[in-house]
């Protein structure tokens, strides 16, 4: 339980730092958006996040459909805070980022 609480606290801290350090949204440029937000956790699969490019890890999530994936980002899931680390992203941005992360790199 302590580990989970610490992980969530660390994620919230990272989310706040990302908003201060990288407030710019890179609309239409998923790799740049990813580097400024999602990559903090998804680059290596921190706290249960499926790693970018790991198609097998993303497969069960993608079976739920893109709308469900976007809702998970918007509302938060597990250690991921609502909005991920891109609170200024639109649903279309989230969908592009999910597509980018869930495909082989």
Q: Where are these predicted regions, by residue range?
A:
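N-terminal signal peptide c-region/cleavage motif recognized by signal peptidases
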Residues: 22-24
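The canonical Cys-X-X-Cys-His
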Residues: 37-44, 97
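Gly/Gly-Pro-rich "capping" loops immediately C-terminal to redox-active cysteine motifs
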Residues: 42-71
